[in-house]
Amino acid sequence: MAKDTTGRLHVTVKSAGRLKHSSKLWLERQLDDPYVQQAKRDGLRSRAAYKIIEIDDKYRFLKPGISVVDLGAAPGGWSQIAAKRVGSAEGRGQVIAIDLLEMPNIPGVTFAQMNFLDDNAPARLFEMMGGKADVVLSDMAANTTGHRKTDQLRIVGLVEDAAAFAADVLRPGGTFVAKVFQSGADATLMTQLKRDFATVKHVKPASSRKDSSERYVLAMGFRGAAGGADEPPV
């Protein structure tokens, strides 16, 4: 599950003669990207952190004291922002970061190395949190094949899985934010979200690259699952 990072660039464009053309373009873009450089200065693990900052600055769902789940969290940029805004490092809220990959510790963030698609994942999360979540975040992107139609289906499928997980673990009134890509393949996803949430919209933060079809779906006001608000999902 691909995510952008701001790790040190060990090669320069000039010395990258052995790289493929696509890799050179990526490297040039990283070196020229002001958000990559700003993330390093701000001590953030990825430029993606600015995306959730922008979205939350406008819609204000990361409130002090709430419970947040970050799916596909590595390298941890979104978790860093969530922890700061809910106050989990000071014990005022909690952030659970979930990923298949290992992730270095972040103050105020509890890391769970697991697959959120496992049947017992919602119950495990519920046990860790002692209740359901107020916000579920997902900046995940499916691994691509280069075949446009196949990739679109994979991307939408991953978001649908994240949305289903959110429906299992969110409290009524909760919020779901997930990365999607502009295409005609997400109609079913949007229909499902509009059924489960009071407000659903697409947002594209300024820090999302202009030449990218990337955008985010923001679903607020979860209508609630069949069970009680704080009973373990089954």
Question: Where would I find each of the regions flagged by the language model?
Answer:
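Class I SAM-dependent methyltransferase "Motif I" SAM/SAH-binding loop
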Residues: 72-76, 181
